[in-house]
């Protein structure tokens, strides 16, 4: 079996539950490691009132003892503090106040209508509660564990916002030397950006959207430093690392496009200005001077930083709602309004880190499989020696 995880829970239910399977034994994981990542997700200028209620903290139920993974399934819970206000609406038994929060005017752009048609639900709350981005808190908790696994092999994950609405911002070209600096800067920024000069413009765009009852999307970059060559494969479509990464990024609510490296810009350029040339020197071995490919060629990691961009549409809940249809009365009305963020791009970047960490961790374990961290480390050390001996690969 391969590394996998599953989540469950509703936005206003008792909490979110997750299970991580096939995590090798011996990975150092603590609740505080996970809580730090959960706190990063909750930050961001443009978040809604829910973040004033929730203070996400994980409770690990199984799979970890004395601070280390056991190799058994890791189960965990994140309680929803807001459930106190929804107990009689989201009860698993009789919902005494069920009628108060019925949703039958689907929001354009949300799962409301399509989900209700698929699952034959007249009350679309039964759809939106699970489709809500609240679920991503459970993903970030799992992602914290995948990051701890990768960090055991000096593989680091990062993210940075690329745009908020129409405001495009500068990003860093990230490497082993500046990774920590970038992490500190984006975590200090309410927009998760290194471009302090453009921060007022981003804030202004969000404030204007709020005043108009609008929402804003944007884009972010995620990357992994220290990925060895050889993860993923060209042998079959599902084994290509780039296809796995894009699928995982687009599983994040509201993400409507993803690219590996400079994929979109590269489509308009001649090949001579796109492909990353290969160089060799006695000191540096095989190396590249550019990384427009995003660290993946032929579906396989090539030893450069693996990086991607994801593009987020504006959140579907608008405080000046669009036209919809009341599916009980069958007449046009304005869509329902749910408490929501104005802009969640900074938070989505943290979720993107988790999804990318999962993709790389899964591919890493497929390549260097083992039941314990020590067993995997032996396999990886042997592979590193092979790369250096046969392929003059010095980035070890």
UniProtKB/Swiss-Prot annotation:
Enzyme class (EC, first level): lyase
Pathway: Metabolic intermediate biosynthesis; chorismate biosynthesis; chorismate from D-erythrose 4-phosphate and phosphoenolpyruvate: step 7/7
GO biological process: amino acid biosynthetic process; aromatic amino acid family biosynthetic process; chorismate biosynthetic process
UniProt GO MF annotations: chorismate synthase activity; FMN binding
Keyword Isomerase: no
Note accompanying the cofactor annotation: Reduced FMN (FMNH(2)).
Keywords: Amino-acid biosynthesis, Aromatic amino acid biosynthesis, FAD, Flavoprotein, FMN, Lyase, NADP
EC number: 4.2.3.5
Cofactor (UniProt): FMNH2
Reactions the enzyme catalyzes: 5-O-(1-carboxyvinyl)-3-phosphoshikimate = chorismate + phosphate
InterPro entries per UniProt: Chorismate_synth (IPR000453), Chorismate_synth_AroC_sf (IPR035904), Chorismate_synthase_CS (IPR020541)
GO cellular component: cytosol
Keyword Flavoprotein carried by entry: yes
Binding positions for FMN per the UniProt entry: 130-132, 298, 313-317, 339
Domain of life from the UniProt record: Bacteria
Positions of NADP(+) binding: 41, 47
Quaternary organization: Homotetramer.
PANTHER family, sorted: CHORISMATE SYNTHASE (PTHR21085:SF0)
Function: This reaction introduces a second double bond into the aromatic ring system.
Family statement drawn from the similarity comment of this UniProt entry: Belongs to the chorismate synthase family.
Protein name per Swiss-Prot or TrEMBL: Chorismate synthase
